[in-house]
A protein has these predicted regions:
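Aromatic-enriched alpha-helical interface/lid elements that frame and gate functional surfaces
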Residues: 235-308, 312
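Glycine-rich beta-alpha junction loops
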Residues: 42, 128-129, 204-209, 244-246, ...
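Active-site-adjacent elements of ketosynthase-type condensing enzymes
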Residues: 209-228
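Oxidoreductase and adenylate-handling cofactor-binding alpha/beta cores
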Residues: 175-198, 214-220, 260-267
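Terminal low-complexity tails and localization/encapsulation signals of metabolic enzymes
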Residues: 1-11, 241, 320-395
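Conserved Rossmann-fold dehydrogenase catalytic segment
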Residues: 130, 159-169, 190-208, 226-232, ...
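N-terminal helix-loop segment corresponding to the beta1-alpha1 unit
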Residues: 1-192, 288, 366, 372-395
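Short, well-structured beta-strand/strand-turn elements
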Residues: 35, 306-320, 381-386
Length: 395
């Protein structure tokens, strides 16, 4: 194993807020990048005040800002803009998720940043992109869910009622798309003869269209006539109630013998009604499946299907997922004692590289925790920092 993580030495300036940008920056920190998070004085990141908290630190903020240093700078003041520009001049990556053009208001216009620091990867998240009739519209996760098909695909087939996905998938999908783009841009910079950086843009709209397209849009990709009516399996899969909980069983589109034997109905595998499962018979077959599962406990259901090598899983409440035996065996949800919040759980990075370690940082910064240290690194004297704090430029 090498002695340092993949992005050791890469400096990231994070002037984003809430979820999409901060999560992307944290993922880079997990890969070893040095990340500085910027918040305006007296305007903490929204996530600092949302959800469960202890001693002033919320789990939401911790889950999106581990491993960063935090400074508090007023980018609306000229001297604050000068500080941000100095940080951008020293950065390898800048991440912002403001509406198009708004970053100029804090002195971080992309063209000017790249003119001063040609090696910079200037990474922007926006709602609909920088061109088009909706490019300046305000956007949040649930709006993007609505316009990219995520809400529609949640629609109940029986009632026709559409529904949201009750977390923020559109933001998180965009975060991961931005990290992909940033890593590619850093690699491209290494190959460029002059080591030049570039602007990188990810719109929430396009990131989530790309996310939906491979499977959820399989019936809406071919333009014009198709060979015959197809089926989108995702519309038919169910959650099955047990005596004491619920399970999910898959697949239903492949060989059925194992499923039929698991529910003690082997004859169904040869039943003419179910020789090919499609829109005409899937509901009927699943009704039979549901009838048997409803007579079993969750443990009995898992045992019956596992015995016949049928993929099955229990519906686990969120407050119990850290106790899943696989999560415990792999250390997927480690616990740490972290100031000021105390004992806290977090999901480890999704990747495992045999020769390059990831960093699961154990701390998230308090508001402006590293302002003085970072300004000192820029060359500011203690009395200059005190003067800036006195006029509200920093905190």
């Amino acid at each position: 194993m090498t002695k340092h993580p993949a992005l050791k030495g890469i400096r990231v300036l994070d002037v984003s807020s809430v979820l999409s940008g901060p999560l992307a920056a944290m993922l880079l920190a997990d890969l070893g990048a040095e990340v500085i998070k910027v918040e305006p004085p007296n305007i903490p990141d929204f996530t600092r005040g949302t959800g469960d908290a202890r001693n002033g630190m919320t789990a939401y903020f911790y889950n999106t800002n581990r491993g960063k240093r935090a400074i508090s700078v007023n980018g609306r003041q000229p001297e604050g803009q000068r500080i941000l520009q100095q940080l951008a001049d020293q950065a390898d990556v800048l991440i912002q998720n403001m509406r198009p053009g708004k970053a100029s208001g804090i002195g971080l216009d992309p063209s000017q940043c790249l003119q001063r620091n040609p090696a910079l990867i200037y990474a922007s998240i926006n709602g609909y992109g920088t061109v088009g009739p909706m490019s300046e519209e305000p956007v949040y996760d649930y709006v993007i869910q609505a316009v990219t098909g995520i809400v529609d695909v949640q629609r109940d087939r029986a009632s026709g009622t559409a529904d949201l996905s009750h977390h923020f998938p559109a933001d998180k999908i965009t975060s991961h798309a931005l990290v992909e783009a940033i890593l590619a841009a850093l690699f491209a910079r290494e190959r460029h003869p002059d080591g030049r950086g570039q602007e990188v843009e990810v719109s929430m709209h396009e990131a989530n269209l790309a996310y939906m397209w491979p499977d959820a849009m399989m019936q809406h990709s071919i333009v014009g006539d198709v060979d015959g009516p197809g089926i989108y399996p995702g519309e038919y899969y169910r959650v099955y109630s047990t005596i004491d909980g619920a399970v999910v069983v898959m697949p239903l589109m492949g060989p059925m013998a194992g499923i039929c034997e698991a529910i003690n109905r082997p004859e169904l595998a040869k039943d003419p009604r179910f020789q090919a499962l499609d829109a005409s018979n899937l509901d009927e077959f699943q009704d039979l499946l549901a009838e048997q599962i409803s007579k079993w406990t969750t443990e009995e259901t898992l045992s019956a299907f596992s015995e016949h090598d049928v993929p099955v899983g229990p519906v686990i409440p969120r407050n119990e997922i850290h106790d899943h035996p696989q999560a415990k065996a792999r250390g997927s949800v480690p616990e740490h004692d972290v100031f000021p919040v105390g004992r806290i759980r977090s999901a480890r990075p999704a990747w495992r590289m045999k020769e390059t370690p990831e960093l699961l940082h154990q701390g998230a910064p308090t508001m402006g925790e590293h302002t003085d240290v970072v300004l000192a690194e820029l060359g500011y004297l203690p009395e200059e920092i005190a003067a800036l704090r006195h006029v509200g430029t920093v905190a």
